Amino acid sequence: MYKAETRGISVTVQSRFVEEESSPTESRYFFAYTVEIVNNGSEQVQLRSRHWRIIDGHGACQEVRGTGVVGKQPVLEPGESFCYTSGCPLNTPDGLMAGSYTMATVAGESFEAEIPAFSLDSPHVRRSLH
């Protein structure tokens, strides 16, 4: 599990390789990740948007931005949490994801809550020792 906290917003991520949706012979690898966002702060916040940096096993970086997560812009009162699962296809058997959520307070102030960097690992990775 990977965890980061920004201004009382805790983001925990767990990833897994999805063999049944992957085809290694065609360089298609699919990963699922589950995110839990917890408001440990003292004020209500709303998740407005997301920004992901996805880096494949060759170091190629793709940036993804969008409104909300899984079609929602959840509002979190102090002590509340929101959990969702999504997925990421790669052309390599391993990679890395990291990013941030744009959060907004009731007063209209926006800030970036860090999504911790987490690895995308499959059993198809060939490691070489030098």
Swiss-Prot record:
Pfam families xref list: DUF525 (PF04379)
Recorded superkingdom: Bacteria
GO biological process: error-free translesion synthesis
Residue ranges of every copy of the ApaG domain listed in the record: 3-127
The name this protein goes by in its record: Protein ApaG
Species this chain originates from: Methylobacterium radiotolerans (strain ATCC 27329 / DSM 1819 / JCM 2831 / NBRC 15690 / NCIMB 10815 / 0-1)
Organism lineage: Bacteria, Pseudomonadati, Pseudomonadota, Alphaproteobacteria, Hyphomicrobiales
